[in-house]
Amino acid sequence: IYVYNQGNENYAVNFAQLTKTDGSFIVAREEMPNFTLEDLKGKDILGGRKGGVPLMTLEYVLKKNGLTIGTNKEAGEVNVRTDVQFGVMAGAFAGGEGDFTTAFEPTGTQMEEEKTGYIVASVGELSREVAGDIPYTAYSTTKEFMADNEDLIQRFTNALYKGQQWCKTASSEEIAQAMQPFFNDLSLNDLISVVDRYKEVDAWCDNPLFTEESLNALVEIMEEAGELDKAPVYNDIVNTDFANKAMENVK
């Protein structure tokens, strides 16, 4: 969206959607089984990079639930910090930075294992309540590459759809076993917990179709964050031909 709005002619075009909600979680320093967003009032939370979707989604959720983002914690404002790089947020939190942080899996599970943090809420579930589904993760390529490699992209999308269909029926243990070669520092039980969490929040798409409704939800979040001057044209940055063909032909 950013590159498209800059006027670059060879901008990226989305052709398949992978996840339909934010995959991050709010992490506290202690177990909080009765956590609500009100618990963030007057607190610091590590939110990620300015202009990034994780931060924008978190701030959108807070605003839509009546919280005020700012640095006046005595007045109950939530101080969403953007000064800690995304890749070191968990380590910074373990080192004492912030009262809360956000984390994706498997980082959240690792923090619980190390007792440096405890997952208390899903940003994805909270954002779905106020914005609906959003195209959080999608596959894209440049206009030129797409025009020259339609067969390759179609075969890739077909394979993705097969994987999505398999994930619908596979058990958490089966999915975790398939993931394990890529996460060899995590136990199978930890990976099962990761899969369970993402199943519970319904994060994964059942098919690769990238809808206009979901793009509009993301655009609203970006506009609320002040990061978007104009909305992109859906048909310019999304091509659904590959997804539709995959859904028609892959059995």
Predicted regions: what they are:
Residues I1, E59, T109, Y161, ...:
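Predominant activation on well-ordered alpha-helical scaffold segments within soluble catalytic domains
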Residues I1-D83, A92-G95, D99-E105, V120-S122, ...:
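Short, glycine-/small- and polar/acidic-enriched structural segments
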Residues G7, Q85-F182:
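Pocket-lining segment of extracytoplasmic ligand-binding domains
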Residues G70-N72, E125-G132, E200-E212:
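Short, solvent-exposed loop/beta-turn-alpha elements that line the ligand-binding surface or hinge
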Residues M146-D229:
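Secondary-structure end/capping motifs
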Residues N216-K251:
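Conserved C-terminal helix/tail region of periplasmic/extracytoplasmic solute-binding proteins
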